Amino acid sequence: MPIAVPTPTPIPVPADLGVFLTSDKTAYEENSTVAFSVYYNNKLGTPAEKVVVKAEIPQNTTVVDAAKGTVSGNTISWDIGSLNGKATGEIIFKIKLGALSASEVNMSSKATISSANQMTKTDDDESIFNFMGFSKKIAGKPHTKFINGYENKQFRPENMITRAEVAKILVTALSLAKAKDTGKKFKDVDNKHWAYDYIVTAVNSGIFSGYNDGTFLPNKAITRAELSTALAKYLKLKNIEPVKVHFKDINTHWAKNFIEEIYRSKLIAGYSDGSFKPDAQIKRSECVTIICRLLNRGPLKDADCGFVDVNKTHWAYGYIAEGSLDHSYTRNSDGSETKKK
């Protein structure tokens, strides 16, 4: 009798794919069109088979351009097929917001990627982009200031901002509940430091941390990388390898992943020479602008911020006014605000 030859068990072929979803801004008026870009890639050198990219769109939106994808309910699917090793791709699709029943509505869209191969390192197989829809027809809640000036009516927009100052701004702007003193101490911040409660709250909330030597360095100017990391942690963005690196000077930087996530979220941009300058210090004018973007606030028009060292021609005037004044406002079509008289 012939000897039966066992059928060999197929060895699963791994696939390591990534997807990156973004848009050109974070606030859109009701009944307007939103364009999303989906970037995807194959990180391995071998092909991935039966690759599918999907995008989930928010409720109260309709698909305007599915980019040759298949629409089913609130999901668009693209059958990519075989994706060669190290290959990349981009899909641009468009949706339209419906009429809103509130002045501001938080929304999000999600992109995912899958394959018939055995997926590995799946943290970057989905990407979420958060944005705000707004209506000019409905009054929004008044905005509360989150940053103060100095004596003699100065704002000092070109001064570098310290880690302690940013801790206070974030705790104030994000309305973080004051944390109990858990006993975690920094050897350079005692309970008599003016920002002690803010630092403790920011650290306990997980958005700030100290250094390996047990210091916090409250008076050190914060860097672009440090602020990017703090914002990413607040937004609970993933510390994952990006599908695409957009800046020439961050490839080996410790904060590369968070920098790319914050860039994807349209909170901090790079420079015209293709750099991000991760270790550059941040000015007060830059910081207030970034926090306003995080909150989808401003810039504020028709407002006098009252600072003698901030001319109305200053590039950040509207954001400085937004962050330093308690005010009621009407929203404009471009997302900016006009202060009510």
Regions flagged by a language model, labelled:
Residues 1-131:
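Exported/extracytosolic protein signature
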Residues 130-197, 204-225, 232-257, 269-281, ...:
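Feature responds to low-complexity, polar/acidic, surface-exposed segments characteristic
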